[in-house]
Amino acid sequence: MTLTDYVREVSLADFGKPFKHQASWNRRLRTTGGRFFPKDGHLDFNPKILEEHGETVFRQIVRHELCHYHLYFEGLGFRHKDQAFKELLAQVDGLRYAPRLQSHQANYLYICQDCGQAYDRKRPINLAVFACGRCHGRLIKKNQS
């Protein structure tokens, strides 16, 4: 079963309305589970959500994006702040926020010498140039284990 077929099935089962556009995977999504594009009506989904959190959570994210989709084409408020969106999301048991992905691993850990603020980074920081954002103290590199 393709992703578009799966979204069509969820749309009919949970909303009673057809999904008439395309759904696709987008590996570049990092912090969201999916995106709705009002311009052409297609949906993008993050495959890492399905891999790490399973089919139940992924189905809730599909419901979330379908709330945007159906409300937009009905001419109702489809944004997160709109009451119609919040009510429909609650009716279909969709997720309000996407769960954090565990695949994001920090490679470097820096600690401020003065205030103890910790900074996890994927890329190294030039310690001669950068300082603590909270107290402007000197940063030191700790071994990540």
From Swiss-Prot:
Domain SprT-like, residue spans: 5-141
Cellular compartments annotated: Cytoplasm
GO biological process, one term: response to stress
Cofactor binding note of this UniProt entry: Binds 1 zinc ion.
Manganese as UniProt keyword: no
Superkingdom assignment: Bacteria
InterPro entries reported in the protein's UniProt record: SprT-like_domain, Uncharacterised_SprT-like
Keywords: Cytoplasm, Metal-binding, Zinc
One Pfam family per UniProt: SprT-like
Active site, renumbered: E65
Chief place where the protein resides: cytoplasm
GO cellular component: cytoplasm
Record-level Gene Ontology MF annotations: zinc ion binding
Name of protein: Protein SprT-like
Entry binding sites for Zn(2+): H64, H68
Annotated family: Belongs to the SprT family.
Cofactor: Zn(2+)
